[in-house]
């Protein structure tokens, strides 16, 4: 049996495709690769309980098989994922300046006797899981699970959600330009956190996020504490985050990604990134 056949067999216990709300994709948060993968698996098995609350039940043996977790490490992984999921706050801003800030998951529990992990989503999230009409992106589960970098996973989600809703243009050879400011991208990828160690968002950051025109540079450079930043220098961010993600996306996904740097001001400071994304499935 080939490596691809093994992966296909392992993933057969879950649907091949996930219809994921762009609300969940575009929200600002930081998560580990394992957490993102467990969340993706949970979203394929979520149902409404008797109280009308979204609940997903996962077998730990399935998680171990699909995510290749071995030995006694599973218990530690589950605790870390549960703690992170239960504390995740979703912040999303729409184009008109409206925003929503809410918790994603209320309770995560594990029963050792049955070997099951139950994830209870907050009731307010229901509309962003079920009955999605247009504001969603189809994600290939086996392909998403193949990513080895959390940066690849998140950047793929972000770029795919934009390209998925872009119209095909034969004059541009199906190349879509997706632009992000550097600070904005850092927030979306999670190299900059807006929550402190206690899970709180600074009031000044909250006020800035409530504005119709958000100044991401001001948030990242002035309001976020240094200890909440990773790969702050551009050279580190480019080498250890951006280039790693683009390389893996090009190797494993249905997107081909290149990018150009946007410069301005004195000395040609880099302020943004123009991604050239080609959907190879169109």
Regions found by a protein language model. Give the residues of each.
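Charged, alpha-helix-forming regions
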Residues: 1-282
